[in-house]
Regions:
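Interdomain "pre-motor" coupling segment immediately N-terminal to P-loop NTPase/helicase cores
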Residues: 49-108
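Hydrophobic side chains in well-ordered alpha-helices
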Residues: 29, 36, 67-71, 255-258
Length: 365
């Protein structure tokens, strides 16, 4: 880590720390137009950042400077390595350190799963790293979280990695062919034409992770299978890495059917977002399974959040806004139910007849 020396504070509230940067080109650390340093300033707006030569001076309150120094240390470590180094990495690192000061962003972001055509596929948040680690340590893993958190992409990367390492003999990618209220019978074309759009995201991800010329051969040989969930019924899947995507659109019966396909030497990753259920009626199999299998060994539920969104930064804010809206809507619905129940009780009490005197006529004590 870079060495740092305290400079005499200008007063009791402000202190300065000088970070000496060694072993890395300042151009890489600063980024184009000092973009990365500006990202540090955005992460710690109360800290003044000044760069001169290979020195970075951080000035501000003691706690803020210490946090900024820790972030700079991690960025220097990443700059020395082969980590994809951009302003998103700075933002992610700052968020990691804020949520868990004991974590090392440089270590988290350096864990490459695959390298394809010069591009490394790796976890980009702490939540993603814990998710990937869970896949390594458990036979069945559920990745539950909002859109853009890398649930399916990382699961497929782990599947390709397992195939390349000969840990499994084939990859099976599946998803229910129900989405956004559409029914297959009303869609034009053959069954293949109807199903293909639902599976297209899986094909696209495969072509990013593997040589596009190799993928069709593996599909033709059955080494990689991409099929709708209905095609899993009645099968036992041995020595396979199986990924079920969009699991929130499975019924409880379909989820049970799918999980019981597990054979010897196989692993399963189930991904979904319980806030995007497209089933016309009934409950989601993904929602139910979190309660049914919560205590079963060798099954892990990894929950990702808006902090793990790796698409445009606006996506995370959109997810948070919808989460807040849904929570407020549920609270309002609950309040209405309580008011309605109280009103019904009042009406019943108002309409209840007075108790009648049933003593015989002429009765005396």
């Amino acid at each position: 880590l870079p060495s740092s020396n305290e400079i005499t504070p200008s007063d009791d509230a402000i202190e300065s720390v000088l970070v000496e940067v060694d072993g890395v080109a300042m151009v890489r650390l600063l980024g184009p137009q000092d973009r990365l340093i500006k990202a540090v300033e955005r992460a710690h707006p109360t800290v003044d950042v000044a760069v001169r030569g290979n020195q970075i001076r951080l000035s501000g309150t003691a706690d803020a400077v210490a946090a900024a120094e820790r972030l700079v240390d991690e960025l220097v470590t990443m700059a020395r390595g082969e980590v994809d180094f951009d302003d998103a990495a700075v933002t992610t690192s700052a968020r990691m350190l804020k949520s868990d000061p004991g974590v090392s962003p440089a270590e988290v972001l350096s864990q490459a799963i695959l390298t394809s055509r010069g591009k490394s596929i790796r976890p980009k948040t702490l939540g993603q790293k814990l998710y990937v680690d869970a896949i390594d340590e458990n036979t069945i893993v559920f990745g539950i979280g909002p859109a853009g958190t890398g649930k399916t992409y990382l699961a497929m990367a782990k599947a390709v990695q397992a195939l390349q390492r000969k840990e499994v003999e084939r990859i099976i990618l599946t998803r229910p062919a129900v989405e956004a209220g559409e029914r297959l019978g009303y869609l034009p074309g053959t069954l293949t034409d109807k199903i293909d759009p639902y599976l297209r995201p899986l094909y696209d991800a495969l072509n990013e992770m593997m040589d596009p010329e190799v993928v069709p051969k593996l599909l033709a040989a059955g080494t990689i299978e991409v099929a709708p969930l209905a095609y899993m019924r009645g099968r036992t899947l041995n020595n396979s890495f199986i990924v079920l995507d969009e699991a929130q659109n499975t019924t409880p019966e379909q989820m049970k059917m799918f999980l019981t396909r597990l054979g010897h030497g196989s692993r399963i990753v189930v991904t979904g977002d319980v806030t995007q259920v497209d089933l016309p009626t009934g409950s989601s199999g993904l929602q139910l399974v979190t309660r049914v299998l919560a205590e079963v060994d060798d099954i892990h539920f990894a929950r990702l959040s808006s902090d793990d969104v790796v698409r445009h930064t606006l996506v995370g804010r959109i997810v948070d806004a919808y989460t807040k809206f849904d929570a407020e809507k549920q609270a309002a619905a609950y309040q209405r139910e309580q008011v309605d129940a109280a009103n019904r009780a009042d009406r019943r009490a108002a309409n209840r007849p007075e108790p009648q005197d049933r003593r015989p006529k002429g009765w005396r004590r």
